[in-house]
Regions:
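Mid-chain, well-packed structural core segment of small domains
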Residues: 58-88
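Low-complexity RS/RG/RGG-rich segments used by eukaryotic RNA-binding proteins and nuclear co-regulators
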Residues: 90-92
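Short S/T/G/P-rich N-terminal loop/turn motif that feeds into the first structured element of a domain
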Residues: 1-55, 64-74, 94-118
Length: 118
């Protein structure tokens, strides 16, 4: 099971660019399917959120090896898709995410630092 991911969050489409938003979303889904088939990522899942008064309307969580995801994140195709998404949806962003066993590691380090500093 992957212990690292990319959280790719997005807000609502820019008014008047809804069709382009659908187009770029579909391009991204095709890209992630291809990455998964090639073994470059373990899995991905897209989520649409219910309206809640906030800016985040959905996200895609891409799971995989940290080094592979770092290469993907700086690849020409990922950068191109990110630029396209940023032009048609509000609040687009990509954030690295610790998953699985890395959560335990992060909590251990955090607790050690709390003990040292308090």
């Amino acid at each position: 099971m992957a212990d690292f991911g990319l959280f790719i969050g997005f807000g609502y489409p820019v008014r008047g660019r809804e069709r382009q938003a659908v187009k770029v979303f579909n391009e991204a889904m095709e890209y992630y399917v291809r990455l998964q088939q090639q073994g470059d990522i373990e899995s991905f899942e897209s989520v649409f959120l219910e309206p809640h008064g906030g800016e985040l309307s959905g996200f895609t969580l891409v799971r995989g090896d940290r080094d592979k995801l770092a290469r993907i994140r700086t690849s020409d195709e990922f950068v191109r898709l990110s630029i396209r998404a940023g032009l048609i949806v509000e609040q687009f962003g990509v954030v690295g995410a610790d998953l699985g066993e890395r959560i335990g590691t992060q909590m251990r380090v955090y607790n050690e630092q709390v003990e040292d500093l308090t």
